[in-house]
Amino acid sequence: LRDNQDDSDFSAFMSIWFYEEQKHSLVLMDYLKRFRPDMVPTEKELHAVRFPFDPAPALETLMLHFCGEIRLTQWYRRASEWHTEPVIKKIYDTISKDEARHAGAYFRYMKRAIEKMGGEAKLAFAKIGVLMASSGKSGKPLHPTNLHVNKNLFPNDTVQSRLPDPEWLERWLDSQIQFDKVWENRV
């Protein structure tokens, strides 16, 4: 919303997107409360990942969201395949489908931007696309949660850096759900 204030249609979509993303976290936390209460995040931990992002160019923000949704689609799909417990499998499968639908919506907004702005939009999308696609070479998964977003808070300005265990994501991907090169290539 911050970077697209002049686009009421996109802003309306972002409101729906935010609601659905909140739904994902609430469902996952409810699952933890029922089956792994020792892993439920505290209010302090939740508050730590809520901080302001610096303003960013609207087109790059759009592409970043698209890339994040594509990556999350695959992460959750892999988590659903990896787990054997039926409830969490279904939760991850449903979230994966939601993320794919979100990516589709972002893609439609990207196509609209290309129709309106042509080369300017293509250049902005290419810059972020190269950044997000390079994660296989860096050995670290690139997703908006581990990109620096607030100069005044650097280096503690990524969502991942504010987790109680900042190395959790890599461990989950590499050791638990085994998001390997085959899965990375799907992204």
Where do the language-model regions lie?
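Non-heme di-metal
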Residues: 1-187
